[in-house]
């Protein structure tokens, strides 16, 4: 029964990580410089999952749930014509992050719904465990 809680917990952690990445993408959609001040736009980050959480295993050693396998930067930028911008190149273009706020918002809703589904699953498991304890006691 605890395996079900481990699975839900791994899903909560994975979706929280995904939502943090989406939030960072939205916040940095207009970040056009790197730490050194050069026109090097923020790169969109994408979270990838893999089945099985190495920290949650059955007695047989089988991994349960899900885990974040990687967080990768998606290369690319959007060139905008802004000749008066101090970061413009010789042709007057400035590199901006290739981030679509509407797409990120849809991903955020999806992550939120998956997070909520994991909470419901954990609550159902908790209720089942409480009922089983009442039967035993």
Language-model features and meaning:
Residues 1-137:
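Amphipathic alpha-helical polymerization modules
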């Amino acid at each position: 029964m605890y395996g079900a809680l481990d699975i839900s917990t791994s899903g909560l952690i994975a979706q929280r990580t995904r939502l943090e990445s989406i939030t960072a993408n939205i916040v940095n959609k207009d970040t056009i410089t790197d730490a050194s001040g050069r026109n090097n736009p923020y790169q969109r980050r994408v979270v990838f999952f893999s089945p099985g959480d190495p920290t949650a295993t059955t007695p047989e050693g089988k991994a349960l749930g899900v885990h974040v396998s990687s967080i990768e930067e998606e290369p690319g930028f959007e060139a905008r014509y802004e000749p008066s911008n101090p970061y413009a190149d010789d042709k007057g273009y400035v590199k901006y992050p290739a981030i679509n706020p509407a797409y990120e918002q849809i991903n955020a809703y999806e992550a939120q719904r998956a997070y909520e589904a994991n909470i419901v699953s954990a609550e159902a498991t908790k209720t089942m465990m409480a009922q089983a304890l009442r039967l035993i006691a």
